[in-house]
Amino acid sequence: MAQEKAKVVHGPGPRGVGGPRPKVENPGKLLKRIMGEVFRHYLPHCIIVLFCIVASAMANVQASLFLQTLVDDYIVPMTQQANPDFAPLLGALLKVGCIYLVGIIAAWCNSRIMVNVTQGTLRNLRVQLFTHMESLPIKYFDQHPHGDIMSVYTNDVDTLRQMLSQSIPQLISSAITIVSVFVSMCVLDIRLTVVTMLMVALMLFTTKKITSQSGKYFIAQQRDLGKLNGYIEEMMEGQKVVKVFTHEQKTLAGFRELNDKLKDSAKQANSYANIIMPVTAQLGNVSYAVCALVGAAMAVGNVGGMTLGTVMAFLALNKSFNMPISQVSMQANSIIMALAGAERIFKMMDAPSEADEGYVTLVNAKYDRDDNLVETEERTGIWAWKHPHHDGTTTYHKLAGDITFTGVDFGYVPEKTVLHDINLYGRPGQKIAFVGSTGAGKTTITNLINRFYDISDGKIRYDGINIQKIRKSDLRRSLGIVLQDTHLFTGTVMENIRYGRLDASDEECIAAAKLANANGFIQRLPDGYNTMLTGDGANLSQGQRQLLAIARAAVADPPVLILDEATSSIDTRTEALVQRGMDGLMYGRTSFVIAHRLSTVRNADCIVVLEQGRIIERGSHDELIAKKGKYYQLYTGNLAEN
């Protein structure tokens, strides 16, 4: 049956390919939010990491500065001695080795701690993402390709891993190194420092030009990757349909177009990114060579007291200065890419949760000595609506399963109403069947009962209570639902049945399977109820999956059943077995049924005929046949869509 949902609108080209290049908005705000997530849980770790980064940077600077002393005070004097004493030199080299050892230990500690910080932060982000995802309304998943959502969990989160574990620590280290080296160079020789800074200005100008181009392509790369993942996921789910209609070549063409789009954006992004390091490295080499020539000339000419040790120490500092500038350029691209991923992550996390203003809850209840309903912690088989009032009092109303629609209008989007003035009721124990052409609104009505969507106008009452006053989790707990698309989870058969009520015993699950007439085929499985199901129950037939879905609804023991296409995928023999089981399951419960075959709803207490979102007929099977209206045409004509 068609679902009357808002369609996802994409940009030009397949699935939005070819639209304008996006830009990261508020990068500073995004970075602040990311670091807020890190500091919230790992502030002490970050302080230690910062200390290690400073220690490592200072060790490198000190080693470079000590080179002046090593050359001028040890090596040069030894060249003028006939029998030089190597002991002082070895002591000096040992001192240099200790300085480098401190730097190595600090860098190792920094790396180890950042692994813990990074993985812990990503774990927390994934938990927040998944927790928030479960609070999102159904319409969010209708409007966003599932593969694109998966891409947020995988690709976008991975860009944050690179940024947190490598880019930001390296950026901080580079900044500290640049400042400390600059001060040291100024102390050694201000003239060579000016020469170095002129070359650095050229490096920064070049880097800015390159990163300004690469940033927009990194954002596009993440977007195109999400679209490709969405397409792959969609085609994997629809492989049977693709093969039935022999659309492999068409599907491949769509994949190639999206894949080529990703290739282009990734090529452009990485072309700019990959050129940064070689360009800055070569400019750094030029800076090194110029400083070496100028310094050597000054030392040979004894200009300003320049010594060989000063030149060598300055060249070491020059190398230490140019390297972090090159790294800053590279890490800037990585951070831009990570911010593009972070923007998608936080966009999903900031999507509005499913609104729920309900305050009426469902509780276990029992009758006291005065025959009044009271709340209890024990499972008694009696459920009651707990209704708090403004005056501070609380009343309990037994859950019966009475559903009433009064003047209900609804549209998936505000400008298009798909249900018009729906008035109907289902009393406890009644079976209400919805029939009509595809797109008439049958599935939409059941979506409104469980509040997957909220109505635009009118009222839906459950046991006399406006369902908008009932907390959604409690409302849905009172409903047993067999969805149009049967979905089973990876796990055993028993676990899938128990999904209907997690505290159900094995005996209750088996009883539910028997009620749904699923026990027979389950017993014939290799491991019976302990048989492992593969992805979405792929190792079961369509009918067997449907039977398990019915058993899953049965174990919940709900007062209201919603059976959306419950027997549409079951053969005639299996349908007869299921129908007998369902008749027993529906006894004493309000049941709303949609079925392909009108023969399955002949025994309904009320059949509601829908057309273009309006109720055009209602009554029992015999009454509607006697009217010889739309239902009569559907029933006797055996129309394909029904």
Residue ranges: model-predicted function:
Residues 13-23, 119, 127-151, 155-157, ...:
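Short intracellular "coupling" helices and adjacent cytoplasmic loop segments at the cytosolic face
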Residues 82, 365-642:
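ABC-type nucleotide-binding domain
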Residues 32, 51, 106, 110, ...:
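Hydrophobic alpha-helical transmembrane segments of ABC transporter permease domains
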Residues 20-28, 52, 59-75, 99-146, ...:
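Juxtamembrane helix-loop junctions of ABC transporter transmembrane domains
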Residues 1-60, 75-96, 110-114, 118, ...:
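Membrane-integrated ABC transporters
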Residues 41, 45-58, 62, 99, ...:
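Transmembrane helices of ABC transporter permease
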Residues 77, 184-198, 268, 272-343, ...:
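Helix-loop-helix
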